[in-house]
Amino acid sequence: MQQTYQYGWIIPFIPLPIPILIGVGLLLFPTATKNLRRMWSFQSVLLLTIVMIFSINLSIQQINSNSIYQYVWSWIINNDFSLEFGYLIDPLTSIMSILITTVGIMVLIYSDNYMAHDQAYLRFFAYMGFFSTSMLGLVTSSNLIQIYIFWELVGMCSYLLIGFWFTRPLAANACQKAFVTNRIGDFGLLLGILGFYWITGSFEFRDLFEIFNNLIYDNEVNSLFVTLCAGLVFAGAVAKSAQFPLHVWLPDAMEGPTPISALIHAATMVAAGIFLVARLIPLFIVIPYIMNFISLIGIITVLLGATLALAQKDIKRGLAFSTMSQLGYMMLALGMGSYRSALFHLITHAYSKALLFLGSGSVIHSMETIVGYSPYKSQNMVLMGGLTKHIPITKNTFLLGTLSLCGIPPLACFWSKDEILNDSWLYSTIFAIIAWATAGLTAFYIFRIYLLTFEGHLSVHFQNYIGKEKVFFYSISLWGRGASKKINNNFSLSTMNNIESSSFLKKKTYPIAENVRNVTRPFITITHFENKKFYSYPYEPDNTMLFPLLILGLFTLFVGSIGIPFNQEGVDLBILSKWLTPSINLLHQKLSNSMDWYEFWKDTVSSVSIAYLGIFIASLLYKPPYSSLQNFDLINSILKRGPKRILWDKIINGVYNWSYNRAYIDSFYTRSFTGGIRGLAKLTHFFDRRIVDGITNGVGVINFFIGEAIKYIGGGRISSYLFFYLTYVSIFLLVFFII
């Protein structure tokens, strides 16, 4: 067993040869490398599969022996300081390694077909390989220095992948926004790391935890300074995991290719912040203020992410805000001290969300056959609907991920979310009520996405998108499907410049050639499709895109079973508890692992009821128009025109504007921080040009005129010398006698 652990250092470096070889090949043998480009995807999958097998082997050994292995190389600089590098193999490392590799393999297989017609195919797989290396290096790090190095590499890779289509202005702005926002958190992380080193004198986790706990126990450290350092470290996790208030980069990150969105949202970048807090939980756990602060940020993010997802029309942005809310659940669990439930939800959510994002990519891929390459149209749920009969496999797998995220048993997310909700009642009643209500909102908005995408008729034809009849306006409100209607030109539903809505109001025709579909985008030109037919309706993608959906669907069905505590009658099947032994769980330190089935069913009824309520309301409002007229009659009979109806409409519009405008947080940041920095830059520019340059230029001009005067005086004429001499003497005497 120990021989297996000794080779743990190789885990991050196995995927690394692919980006190196691609770079060298493009530099030295560009033609041959491009001709063999499909070979690189196979090698990427093969190497990541090797890492997955190795990680599974380590996990099995840990489950059986509850062992932790750490290896350190010391580089002694002097007697007072030594720089150490190594790797740490513990339950958290093995969980994250399996998560990264399994989701990564599915994304790579999916991307082989999804990116097949992209000219930057090789660059994509080079970035993906480096991304996997960076994340695997992060989770195997044994000290804070290595954590920070790989933390920055993960941020750099996310910057490259979000801005993959960098010649598109939106993608370029999105990657810059993600980079700058994460730099704020990373600066706090660096300061926090240096602060903890100043306190303990060590970067190694084991020494750091032991020394710090002893200092806290003996009351030999300033509590305010310790809290500040812990808060700065937590700021790094807040930015990376898109927690309030540094969440603003996440929806814009959808400008990258859809497989990148799946990888970032499931197992890599956003999971890094959760991993950091979980790794440093022995530090945070002895600082009550920080634990309370973590849970507070978590519950705010839970509610904010859910409300912002309510009115999104872009399918990927809706899923992005869903990720933000679910990460808030994980952060809430860590703040409550429920270490096990946080990691459990990290696992279940990763597979469910990867399934949903890859499913959305399949939907987008199929919609492009009708509307052409345009993210405003192919990702717009207003133009979708009725896709069930066109892409049934995608529909069924997407429904599986939808129900899992809603919290419907026995799917994966039900078990983990239910555990977090149960623990929240033991921690804070207010937090528990918010978390429970948000579970209903989650079911509402995620099922809304499903209904708008797959149920009813294909709206791109229904609203005469390529037809002849003029449509005045097509709205998709918060509480129902779109309907054509005339509107007042002075009416403004939201304060944002709604580019998305205007993009599909114009009556245009988007023909598709019979043999060739030319789709041109900046830097990327797609000139050939294998399907040489005219498509007026979407179609199911190739098998290489469907296979990952089916595998992730199986994970969504069965991965929740690893955390179910079936351990009665001497049979212990709670794999996750064995895996995490000894785990940290403040709420259940004195409880046995056996399940109280009465409590389980009581809590299950509560959580499942709110989920079904959200699904029912979404079905009531977003069912196909032809089958929901009676529902609208029922709603109209309940909410008749009058003062109450007017008040209700104002509330609905307020909620819609709040959601669609992202709670006005982006606008606030733009006006306050961005505007303030630009104002300061203008002031600095004015001071530099007018004051600093003015003084410098003024001295030069004065010297010029003085030189000209001296040159005129020194012309060699004695009469001029006498004249100026007598003039200066007269002025001097006059001033002298007056004073």
Swiss-Prot record:
Its recorded reaction(s) are:
a plastoquinone + NADH + (n+1) H(+)(in) = a plastoquinol + NAD(+) + n H(+)(out); a plastoquinone + NADPH + (n+1) H(+)(in) = a plastoquinol + NADP(+) + n H(+)(out)
Function as written in the Swiss-Prot or TrEMBL entry: NDH shuttles electrons from NAD(P)H:plastoquinone, via FMN and iron-sulfur (Fe-S) centers, to quinones in the photosynthetic chain and possibly in a chloroplast respiratory chain. The immediate electron acceptor for the enzyme in this species is believed to be plastoquinone. Couples the redox reaction to proton translocation, and thus conserves the redox energy in a proton gradient.
Q: Which GO terms describe its cellular component?
A: chloroplast thylakoid membrane
Question: Which Pfam families does UniProt cross-reference here?
Answer: Proton_antipo_C, Proton_antipo_M, Proton_antipo_N
* InterPro entries named among the record's database cross-references: NADH_UbQ_OxRdtase_chlpt_su5_C, NADHpl_OxRdtase_5_subgr, ND/Mrp_TM, NU5C-like, Proton_antipo_N
The protein's assembly and partners: NDH is composed of at least 16 different subunits, 5 of which are encoded in the nucleus.
Any GO molecular function? quinone binding
Enzyme Commission no: 7.1.1.-
**Source organism of the structure:** Coffea arabica (Arabian coffee)
UniProt lists the family membership as follows:
Belongs to the complex I subunit 5 family.
Classify the protein's membrane topology as the record does: Multi-pass membrane protein
Check the record and name the Gene3D superfamilies matching this protein.
1.20.5.2700
The entry's protein name is NAD(P)H-quinone oxidoreductase subunit 5, chloroplastic
Q: Please give the start and end residues of each transmembrane region.
A: 9-29, 40-60, 89-109, 125-145, 147-167, 184-204, 224-244, 258-278, 289-311, 318-338, 354-374, 396-416, 427-447, 546-566, 605-625, 718-738
- Recorded name of the encoding gene: ndhF
Q: Which domain of life is it from?
A: Eukaryota
Q: What class of enzyme is it?
A: translocase
> Could you confirm whether the keyword S-adenosyl-L-methionine appears in this record?
no
> Which cellular compartments is it found in?
Plastid, Chloroplast thylakoid membrane
